[in-house]
């Protein structure tokens, strides 16, 4: 128990020394603040530099990822269907595909898959 406390004390001392050494060596100046400020042809930028993000693109990308992951989940079912003597793998995969198709038709009816409106 005492050796663990000694190791913890040594680690604490090393951490404090490294922290203080970093604070002493660190040089912050006015030029660092200027380097981090926006610069555009000698003037501050008049508009926000970030481009607007299309929410329709984000929604389409999320839908694509969801269906992509679901297809990856379907791939092992093919070997289960071929190697099984029961109808359970086929039934479960049909239920899963039905749920996928219902979700796809719902997204289609909501207009989430239409890129241009």
Swiss-Prot record:
A GO molecular-function descriptor: NADH dehydrogenase (ubiquinone) activity
Enzyme type, top EC level: translocase
Primary subcellular site in the record, as a coarse category: mitochondrion
Assigned EC number: 7.1.1.2
Membrane-crossing residue ranges in chain numbering: 4-24, 57-77, 88-108
Pfam families for this protein: Oxidored_q4
Cystine crosslinks: none
UniProt keyword annotation of Translocase present: yes
InterPro entries assigned: NADH_UbQ/plastoQ_OxRdtase_su3, NDAH_ubi_oxred_su3_sf
Keyword tags: Electron transport, Membrane, Mitochondrion, NAD, Respiratory chain, Translocase, Transmembrane, Transmembrane helix, Transport, Ubiquinone
Cellular location(s): Mitochondrion membrane
CC per GO annotation: mitochondrial membrane; NADH dehydrogenase complex
Superkingdom per UniProt: Eukaryota
Catalyses which reaction(s): a ubiquinone + NADH + 5 H(+)(in) = a ubiquinol + NAD(+) + 4 H(+)(out)
Membrane protein topology class: Multi-pass membrane protein
Job description of the protein: Core subunit of the mitochondrial membrane respiratory chain NADH dehydrogenase (Complex I) that is believed to belong to the minimal assembly required for catalysis. Complex I functions in the transfer of electrons from NADH to the respiratory chain. The immediate electron acceptor for the enzyme is believed to be ubiquinone.
Protein family membership: Belongs to the complex I subunit 3 family.
The protein's name: NADH-ubiquinone oxidoreductase chain 3
Top-level taxonomy: Eukaryota, Metazoa, Spiralia, Lophotrochozoa, Mollusca
